[in-house]
């Protein structure tokens, strides 16, 4: 397959609709009534009077198809502690819903593993994902990783170090035994130990663990994202206690900022191919658990520092009106379409029970609707299906049985849903001659495709292919270096003119096709389009036949 990467070609970006102006009646492809993809092909071609030798093909979106694209869709939760069901995959492959049994991986394309650092790193230099580690947690991890692979799901991680509210130490015992400074708290009848994150011994071992993790998991083929902190209660980066502050009485901000800088530097440096996320809430890194409508004045600045290093944003209390309120809404509105957002609901049916009534919810169907509405306002790319060992009282069960329509609605309206509604291409091409391709792109999801994050820089690009008419495989690929999918947001179409030279193309008939390719993988399709008809098994959208001379 010959590749023509056209970064330096003569390109001109022009305003939406100009290149497609014509005195004919066409279907409005940005209508909200469009459903199934139309038949793209010679019968639907219209001569392009503005580009001699070109014809225009129109494409309809498909609103019903579930797309499993990078950093999009539902996230299925799991852990590797003792509470994990021994029949996890069997349970989720035969999952009860309000409409019958479903396979959850048909809806979710990410498996999120949130757990104790101690479970992933039980001994110094020994890691649960390696073959030489055979602890019960390691066996569960390997089972989950293999099951995710079989279901074409990618992984995501959060590693919690704080043992407060836990029934065992979440930081490995060898860290404590190395004289790292920490503190003890009581969880029921159990006394647990947590490290101070400003302690240099803790930092040495934690950094060693994260670097070992990145060695095997800084791989976008395996991993969807990593949460790049895990400090404080529940790993959400609030209620953080520091040695310099709690034991020595020093001001909090200098220590807090030094720890924040250290950990965000660490993750952003070692995970340069996989997106990393930091929580956004009004008390990032402070010792406060909460304080009503008050907020910390340095939080927004610190989160901004993380974003500047390549971090994206997540929040873990969507739908909780105390913890996701005016400050959080105003904050995330400033980052709309600038960084991707991942959501997690806050209410836990099994433990919170009727406490939801304090937020005005009558039942958990209303909770799910509240989470969904906040997620839509925040333009999130990913939503959560949390795990609970009490299966029928878990959040995943609640979504599929009390709000299944919202599960499906997010699949077809949330994240990003990209497609080109009109493309103008030449009907004949000749070697040594320039061609012009005009194309217009839309996004009908409420999120965005974050090609602007550094981990994805120049990774996903629009490409046009000449397919072999016998097997639909690309023979020649032309990559347009100009369009950025991050610019495509709902309600605004973007138009481009791509000029390139044809070289080395064998004479004969081919099929024009379009797709969004992964340039790091020899221009294989990297993002699937929101279309259905005339799509090859590899993901190319076939357009019409072209003759090469």
Predicted regions located by residue number:
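Extracellular/luminal regions of secreted and cell-surface proteins that mediate adhesion/ECM remodeling
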Residues: 412-549
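Catalytic cores of secreted or luminal carbohydrate-active enzymes
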Residues: 368-425
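Active-site groove signature of glycoside hydrolases
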Residues: 182-202, 206-247
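Aromatic- and acidic-residue-enriched segments that line the glycan-binding/catalytic groove
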Residues: 164-188, 238-250, 292-299
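N-terminal secretory signal peptides that target proteins for export/translocation
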Residues: 1-11
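Aromatic-lined substrate-binding rim segments of carbohydrate-active enzymes
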Residues: 100-185, 256-275
């Amino acid at each position: 397959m010959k590749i023509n990467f056209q970064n330096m070609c003569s390109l001109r970006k022009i305003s939406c609709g100009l290149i497609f102006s014509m005195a004919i009646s066409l279907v409005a492809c940005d209508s909200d009534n469009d459903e199934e993809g139309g038949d793209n092909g010679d019968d639907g071609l219209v001569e392009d009077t503005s580009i001699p030798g070109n014809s225009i093909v129109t494409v309809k979106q498909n609103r019903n198809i579930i797309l499993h694209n990078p950093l999009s869709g539902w996230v299925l939760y799991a852990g590797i502690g003792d509470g994990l069901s021994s029949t996890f995959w069997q349970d989720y492959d035969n999952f009860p819903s309000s409409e019958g049994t479903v396979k959850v991986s048909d809806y979710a394309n990410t498996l999120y593993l949130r757990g104790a650092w101690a479970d992933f790193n039980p001994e110094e230099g020994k890691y649960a994902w390696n073959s030489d580690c055979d602890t019960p947690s390691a066996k569960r991890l390997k089972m989950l990783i293999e099951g995710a692979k079989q279901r074409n799901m990618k992984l995501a991680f959060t590693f919690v170090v704080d043992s407060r509210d836990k029934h065992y130490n979440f930081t490995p015992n060898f860290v404590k035994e190395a004289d790292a400074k920490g503190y003890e708290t009581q969880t029921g009848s159990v006394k647990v130990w947590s490290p101070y994150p400003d302690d240099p011994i803790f930092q040495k071992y934690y950094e060693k663990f994260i670097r070992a993790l990145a060695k095997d998991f800084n791989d976008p083929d395996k991993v969807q994202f990593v949460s790049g902190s895990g400090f404080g209660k529940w790993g959400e980066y609030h209620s953080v206690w520091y040695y310099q502050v709690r034991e020595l009485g020093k001001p909090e901000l200098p220590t807090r900022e030094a720890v924040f800088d250290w950990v965000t530097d660490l993750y952003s440096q070692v995970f340069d191919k996989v997106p990393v996320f930091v929580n956004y809430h009004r008390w990032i890194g402070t010792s406060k658990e909460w304080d009503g409508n008050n907020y910390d004045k340095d939080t927004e600045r610190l989160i901004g520092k993380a974003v500047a290093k390549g971090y994206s944003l997540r929040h873990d209390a969507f739908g909780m009106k105390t913890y996701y309120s005016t400050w959080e809404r105003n904050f995330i509105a400033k980052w709309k379409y600038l960084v991707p957002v991942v959501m997690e609901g806050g209410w836990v049916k099994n433990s919170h029970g009727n406490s939801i009534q304090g937020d005005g919810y009558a039942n958990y169907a209303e909770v799910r609707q509240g989470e969904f509405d906040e997620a839509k306002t925040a333009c999130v790319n990913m939503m959560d299906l949390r795990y609970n060992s009490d299966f029928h009282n878990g959040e995943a069960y609640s979504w599929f049985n009390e709000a299944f329509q919202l599960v499906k609605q997010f699949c077809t309206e949330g994240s990003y849903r990209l497609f080109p509604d009109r493309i103008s291409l030449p009907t004949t091409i000749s070697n040594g001659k320039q061609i012009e391709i005009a194309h217009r792109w839309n996004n009908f999801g409420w999120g965005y495709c974050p090609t602007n994050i550094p981990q994805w820089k120049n990774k996903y690009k629009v490409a046009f292919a000449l397919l072999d008419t016998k097997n639909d495989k690309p023979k020649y690929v032309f990559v347009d270096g100009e369009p950025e999918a991050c610019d495509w947001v709902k309600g605004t179409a973007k138009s481009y003119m791509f000029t390139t030279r044809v070289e080395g193309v064998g004479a004969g008939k081919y099929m024009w096709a379009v797709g969004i390719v992964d340039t790091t993988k020899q221009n294989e399709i990297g993002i699937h389009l929101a279309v259905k008809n005339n799509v090859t098994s590899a993901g190319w959208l076939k357009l019409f036949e072209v003759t090469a001379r």
